[in-house]
């Protein structure tokens, strides 16, 4: 992971110290090379790389698929409940360092069940770490994601296996999502499984409009009936869609450094986040797969502020959006926004 140097501008320092929420993080994508090697040794898993440096050197992605290939290889070291605990606690430490006070975390059960690891094992390890995080002042939710390159039948089977867990962990496991290879796998492919999730009262999110066209965002909204759109940066190509997103306040969980690393944009100065913000869309800033993409939440904020020349009011709005778009109770949302306001406007609103 590359480290972003905190510049000495007042806005950068204010942003780093601000309480914030993360709404787009794949827990398997927080698995740093050092922990991959430690878990491989603990579990007797043979890796294709002979050193941590060799693994880092393989992080030269050209697109989403080339990243996913190595992402799934890295996840192969996760076998036992303790492995999922250790991975999640490492992410929690990063959150605490970045003043992330609330996180809504994705996990990919099919990545593990196809290796014989039950979903219950995955969730038990993650939940134990998140319960420990609560004792340190960080709240969280968990969202089960279906892999879109697999069939809807596979997603339906995964949903049924997970069904008891939605009850057992109803305080934490509050929704479903859709991720993995976007091209050729439109949201419409998963209409039935999202309808089942909706019938249980679960929250719904989906990756759309990262590499896929704006039509995928329409499908996520109209067919899957999502509460939030993950990525969504290609919505800018359709003015009517941008207006709809702005009017409905359906948030986009944008991941700037991920978009740069996966060549969605060839330069961060060309990112659409500010254009969307200017048009009233509820954009947020997130890390996606931080171990692979070179930065956790603060690194994403700092790079985006620098590249897009964001001002104080714009950064405040983005951070506030992260709380507004979260799946917390209205009471907790008000408390989180009050903490942000106390930090951002210490003398009260100006």
From Swiss-Prot:
Q: What Enzyme Commission number does this protein have?
A: 3.5.4.2
Site entry: Important for catalytic activity: 231
Q: Which residues form the active site?
A: 210 (proton donor)
Binding residues for substrate: 289
User: Which residues does Zn(2+) bind?
Assistant: 24, 26, 207, 288
**Could you tell me what the cofactor note in this record states?**
Binds 1 zinc ion per subunit.
GO BP terms: namely:
adenine catabolic process; hypoxanthine salvage; nucleotide metabolic process
* Pfam families membership: A_deaminase (PF00962)
Q: Which residues cross the membrane?
A: none
Record InterPro entries: A_deaminase_dom (IPR001365), ADE (IPR028892), Ado/ade_deaminase (IPR006330), Metal_Hydrolase (IPR032466)
Question: Could you say which enzyme class this protein belongs to?
Answer: hydrolase
A single GO CC term for this protein reads: cytosol
Query: What are its cofactors?
Result: Zn(2+)
The protein's GO terms of the molecular function aspect are:
adenine deaminase activity; zinc ion binding
Q: Which Gene3D superfamilies match?
A: Metal-dependent hydrolases (3.20.20.140)
The reactions it catalyses are: adenine + H2O + H(+) = hypoxanthine + NH4(+)
Locate the coiled-coil region(s) and give their ranges: none
Leader sequence residues:
none
Keywords associated with the record: Hydrolase, Metal-binding, Nucleotide metabolism, Zinc
Q: Which family does it belong to?
A: Belongs to the metallo-dependent hydrolases superfamily. Adenosine and AMP deaminases family. Adenine deaminase type 2 subfamily.
> What is the recorded function of this protein according to its Swiss-Prot or TrEMBL entry?
Catalyzes the hydrolytic deamination of adenine to hypoxanthine. Plays an important role in the purine salvage pathway and in nitrogen catabolism.
Protein's name in the database: Adenine deaminase
The scientific name of the source species is: Paraburkholderia xenovorans (strain LB400)
The organism's lineage is:
Bacteria, Pseudomonadati, Pseudomonadota, Betaproteobacteria, Burkholderiales
């Amino acid at each position: 992971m590359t480290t972003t140097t905190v510049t000495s501008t007042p806005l950068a320092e204010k942003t780093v110290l601000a309480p914030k929420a993360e709404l787009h993080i794949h827990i398997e994508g927080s698995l740093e090379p050092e922990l991959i090697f430690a878990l491989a040794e603990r579990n007797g898993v043979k890796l294709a790389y002979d050193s941590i440096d060799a693994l880092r050197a393989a992080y030269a992605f050209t697109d989403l698929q080339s990243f996913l290939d190595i992402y799934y290889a890295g996840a192969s070291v996760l076998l036992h409940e303790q492995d999922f605990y250790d991975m999640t606690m490492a992410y929690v430490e990063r959150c605490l360092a970045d003043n992330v006070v609330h996180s809504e975390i994705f996990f990919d059960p099919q990545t593990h069940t196809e290796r014989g690891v039950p979903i219950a094992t995955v969730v038990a390890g993650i939940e134990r770490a998140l319960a420990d995080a609560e004792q340190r002042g960080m709240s969280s939710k968990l969202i089960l994601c279906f892999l879109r390159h697999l069939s809807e039948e596979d997603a339906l089977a995964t949903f049924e296996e997970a069904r008891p867990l939605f009850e057992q962990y109803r305080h934490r496991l509050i929704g479903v999502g859709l991720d993995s290879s976007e091209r050729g796998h439109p949201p419409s492919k998963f209409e039935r499984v999202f309808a089942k999730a909706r019938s249980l009262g679960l929250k719904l999110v989906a990756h759309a409009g990262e590499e896929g066209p704006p039509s995928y965002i329409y499908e996520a909204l109209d067919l899957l009936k999502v509460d939030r759109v993950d990525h969504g940066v290609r919505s800018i190509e359709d003015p009517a869609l941008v207006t709809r997103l702005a009017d409905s306040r359906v948030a986009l969980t944008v991941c700037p450094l991920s978009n740069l690393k996966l060549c969605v944009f060839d330069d961060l100065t060309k990112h659409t986040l500010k254009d969307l913000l200017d048009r009233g869309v509820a954009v947020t800033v997130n890390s996606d797969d931080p171990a692979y993409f070179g930065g956790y939440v603060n690194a994403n904020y700092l790079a985006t502020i620098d590249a897009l020349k964001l001002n104080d009011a714009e950064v405040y709005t983005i951070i506030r959006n992260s709380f507004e778009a979260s799946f917390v109770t209205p009471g907790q949302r008000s408390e989180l926004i009050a903490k942000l306001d106390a930090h951002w406007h210490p003398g009260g609103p100006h």
